[in-house]
């Protein structure tokens, strides 16, 4: 039998099936064939799960004396943590679910709950989701202020008044306030704001970050974003790649290393060093603190206020020095342009600037 005959037979089978669908009597409890039925079935498939329901699970969780940390896992949307003078944990987990109808959607939301796991000194609260449909969860939780809190994989985290905070794998904005100890973790793509914290150690990428009144120093790895540190204390150490770093009124030593972008130090209160490549650097001096500035290919600018006493040692290789604002003329020998000068009275702090293929600007 050839291909032509097989195609003819297949055609008869298809036509016969269609004729049967049009002419066969309906089964008991069903309707006969119609194009309306086909359309309704297709529309039902395209609509997916039109049902919607919201459920809030509220509970109080007792703590044992040995618990030191709360870990919150698999909350799909925002997490809000509030530290209080209390001995237990109180939470409200809000679940939004879809389903084929509202009643079924509510049943799915009812099945979306926290599972508790005690791991050494950590209490773990992990959201368990049903296999059916799709659920979104948000959490508001009140905890004892003595607890460290770790949040993973949420979309937006707000935390206040706890012993320490760790953020891992989250998205959305992060706002942390009044954290007695360390703020640690990794974050990317959305803003981070930390106010009143013991210390900070974070890796940040493609975002804006703001840190204010951190008492015990900051260690940051910043990539492709903006980072501002205000009125903090302790040592600051920043690794920067293609970022804009601003440190203002830091009461502790500061080191910024890396390449590309921009670094601004305003009124440093202790010894500071900027070691960059291909980055613009600006330092404003209001007191007697030693500063070292190293960069290439971009402008290095130092602004020396009247309140500062400074022994300046500046040299640009294959570049220039602009000092007209302070009525000074640099000296050029070969490819090196130098400016050495004492600003203020008495013995000042040593300020060293080295730039390659870039300009040095000295201003008041």
Give the residues covered by each predicted segment:
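Intrinsically disordered, low-complexity terminal regions
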Residues: 1-364
């Amino acid at each position: 039998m050839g291909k032509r005959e097989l195609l003819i037979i297949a055609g008869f089978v298809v036509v016969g099936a269609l004729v049967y669908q049009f002419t066969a009597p309906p089964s008991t409890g069903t309707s006969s064939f119609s194009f309306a039925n086909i359309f309704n079935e297709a529309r039902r498939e395209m609509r997916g799960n039109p049902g919607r329901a919201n459920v809030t699970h509220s509970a109080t969780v007792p703590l044992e004396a040995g618990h030191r940390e709360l870990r919150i896992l698999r909350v799909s949307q925002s997490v809000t943590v509030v530290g209080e003078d209390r001995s237990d944990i109180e939470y409200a987990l809000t679940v939004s679910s879809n389903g084929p109808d509202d009643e079924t959607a509510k049943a799915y939301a009812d099945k979306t709950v926290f599972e508790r796991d005690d791991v050494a000194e950590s209490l773990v609260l992990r959201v368990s989701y049903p296999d059916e449909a799709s659920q979104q969860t948000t959490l508001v939780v009140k905890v004892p202020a003595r607890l460290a809190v770790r949040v993973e994989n949420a979309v937006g985290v707000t935390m206040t008044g706890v012993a320490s905070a760790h953020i891992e794998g989250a998205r959305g904005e992060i706002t942390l306030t009044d954290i007695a100890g360390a703020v640690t973790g990794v974050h990317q793509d959305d803003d981070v704001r930390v106010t009143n914290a013991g210390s900070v150690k974070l890796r940040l990428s493609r975002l804006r970050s703001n840190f204010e009144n951190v008492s015990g120093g900051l260690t940051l790895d910043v990539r492709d974003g903006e980072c501002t540190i205000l009125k903090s204390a302790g040592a600051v150490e920043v690794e920067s790649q293609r970022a804009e770093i601003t440190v203002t009124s830091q009461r502790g030593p500061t080191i910024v290393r890396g390449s590309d972008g921009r670094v601004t130090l305003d009124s440093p209160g202790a010894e500071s060093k900027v070691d960059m490549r291909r980055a613009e650097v600006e330092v404003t001096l209001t007191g007697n603190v030693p500063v070292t500035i190293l960069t290439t290919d971009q402008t290095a600018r130092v602004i020396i206020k009247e309140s500062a006493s400074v022994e300046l040692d500046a040299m640009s290789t294959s570049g220039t020095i602009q000092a007209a604002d302070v009525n000074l003329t640099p000296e050029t020998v070969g490819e090196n342009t130098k400016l050495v000068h004492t600003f203020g009275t008495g013995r000042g702090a040593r300020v060293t600037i080295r730039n390659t293929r870039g300009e040095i600007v000295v201003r008041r």
